[in-house]
């Protein structure tokens, strides 16, 4: 016995299977090649063809049209068919025919009738209608083209569209991830400013001022800042005797002017000039605001009271001063309430920068935030230490 596997044998679907013919009560009305009508009794029937006897000879190969007639629940069921004569026996007039161009609904109806007859079930019109309503044939499988049918431009367009959709998706995901990260892991200050301790130079007498330095300029301790002029009458006010209060004497004293100089009390940078040149200033009025050059500028920021646990002393923060592109880092050194009597007031924090800030940045606004998210600084430090 040969048990070798024949590789040429493949699965045979029902549509390809040779159908056994069964004897079913049915009639066939058809037109022959001479357009004459014949009505015969079907001898046997299958989903692929039928046979019958006729007294009129038919030529093998002729394609004829006819109608199969069944009786189901005392109702007539007719199926229009087209068949080809495949064999003819002149001794008994038997014709074997094969169906041609049957519709899927007709094939399903024939299969149902034949299957019910073979199983011994009674054929009902309801079963036939149910068979006609459902799809009894599977769709043909789509063949994968693999892109071989696309032109070079079509492939380029497909790749471009795919890449564009991918880039947009990645950008949208990054935006959403960044927004969520900023919402849950970053505390933003409501306001911030670069602050330094300042020294005010005031006017010693009532008079006019003329500056000798520009704002932002550096000046040494004891160097002249500005000159001022005042009247002799103002100098002697309160020290005049009654004999010197005559109108002519007062007019003479008022016309005499004295000049003086304002000097710097420290090695400083001129932060602001509070009174313009040639303007009158009263005694004790601040004229200049100076910043000691040895002073390290700090950053002051205001946070919401709800963030008090996130901006404790020792917390690392990032800040950016207005007018600069560099993002600097620092550490919170103090934290206090703006108003100790008001329990709902905001929190004021002082930040010491990791690197010194130029004194010229004093008074500039700053954006401050505290990042509490996962950090990869330890991994970066290890990579730098190994020279990667």
Curated annotation (Swiss-Prot):
Keywords from UniProt, A to Z, are: Alginate biosynthesis, Periplasm
Cellular localisation: Periplasm
Molecular function, one GO term: cyclic-di-GMP binding
Q: Which GO terms describe its cellular component?
A: periplasmic space
Q: Which residues form the PilZ domain?
A: 16-115
Q: Which Pfam families match?
A: HlyD_3 (PF13437), PilZ (PF07238)
From the UniProt record, give the pathway where this protein acts: Glycan biosynthesis; alginate biosynthesis
Source domain of life is: Bacteria
- Which family does the entry's similarity section mention? Belongs to the Alg44 family.
According to its UniProt entry, the function of this protein is described as: Required for alginate biosynthesis.
Protein name, please?
Answer: Alginate biosynthesis protein Alg44
Organism per entry: Pseudomonas putida (strain ATCC 47054 / DSM 6125 / CFBP 8728 / NCIMB 11950 / KT2440)
